[in-house]
Amino acid sequence: MSRNEVKEGRLADFIQRSVATAIERDLKDPALRSLTITEARVSPDFHIAYVFWISQNRDEAAKALERAKGKLRSRVAKGCGLRTAPTLEFRYDELQDRAVRIEERIQEALRQDEEMEKQSSEKGFAGEENPYR
């Protein structure tokens, strides 16, 4: 791992913690109460930080994040140790939704398997005994 990759990782961790803490403690917007910061990534040139989030009220939270973007960037700038703080780009974390959909599909497939097993166990062979013995 190169020195830059290590720095990117540390900066991303710092940004994730700073943004999450600022949302929890400093911002009073009710739309951000159910918001969770799931991850942060930093571009190789440290100019852009992609902050991934999830929330129950997606549209309201997205608007609230846009309104708070300047305050959050100021909070990051205070402790990041860079000449200029990275621009924060907020992106909804689709991974969580995909995981939920996959889990639902797995549960549905298991239910169908159980139904088929139940139906096949209730049915017998056409004759008195198993012809395949």
Q: In which residue ranges do the predicted regions lie?
A:
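Charge-rich, low-complexity N-terminal segments
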Residues: M1-I48, I54-R133
